[in-house]
Amino acid sequence: MIEVGDLKKGMFIIYDGEIYRVLEASKHFMGRGSGLVRTKLKNVKTGLVREVNFPSGEKVPEAELSFRKAQYLYRDGDHYYFMTLDDYEQHALSEEEIGDAKYYLVENMEVDLVFHEGVPIGVELPTTVELTVVETEPSFKGDTVSGGGKPAVLETGLKITVPYFIETGDKIKVDTRTGEYVGRA
């Protein structure tokens, strides 16, 4: 058990019988009485984010997880297949368990598989991934005057905003935490 005041970004806890990753945790004190710990939690299985306020002093169970290096192999229907690099064993995760990570997975990519009690429950992506632009509007002289960017569709189906100089077929780096353009690959 861990006290909610000690929660830090990146920790895993069990709340309502589900495993959550702590995205944010901040302490708020009232004028009188005890304070609150406001958290933003992401469900590891479904990817849904929820905000939860805990009274300070409350304790929550910490999830016992293990991480193993794996390679993304392929997608078949609504299942994604991975091979752990230490024992070459294959594991399948459903689209629900993968969540938004599906927009960043490219075949043969190395990721960390998240295991709980020996069963894979999710995937941890690298901070940035390289993806190819498959569809975007052509650039015209004078586009950059207004600033901003233009919409683009990437090889995984992810839709993001990219600078005007990016063309169809370009490889770009995308931040997996925010889904934003980082730079050219």
Curated annotation (Swiss-Prot):
Any Pfam family hit: EFP
Q: Which GO terms describe its cellular component?
A: cytoplasm
Give the pathway listed in the UniProt entry for this protein: Protein biosynthesis; polypeptide chain elongation
Q: Which InterPro entries match?
A: Elong-fact-P_C, NA-bd_OB-fold, Rib_uL2_dom2, Transl_elong_fac_P/YeiP, Transl_elong_KOW-like, Transl_elong_P/YeiP_cen, Transl_elong_P/YeiP_CS, Transl_elongation_fac_P
- GO BP terms, alphabetized: peptide biosynthetic process
Compartments it resides in: Cytoplasm
Q: Name one GO molecular function term.
A: translation elongation factor activity
- From which residue to which does any coiled coil extend? none
Listed A to Z, the keywords are: Cytoplasm, Elongation factor, Protein biosynthesis
Give the family from UniProt. Answer: Belongs to the elongation factor P family.
Question: What's its job?
Answer: Involved in peptide bond synthesis. Stimulates efficient translation and peptide-bond synthesis on native or reconstituted 70S ribosomes in vitro. Probably functions indirectly by altering the affinity of the ribosome for aminoacyl-tRNA, thus increasing their reactivity as acceptors for peptidyl transferase.
Matching entries from HAMAP family are given as: EF_P (MF_00141)
Question: How is this protein named in the record?
Answer: Elongation factor P
Q: Whose protein is this, by species?
A: Thermotoga neapolitana (strain ATCC 49049 / DSM 4359 / NBRC 107923 / NS-E)
Name the gene that codes for it: efp
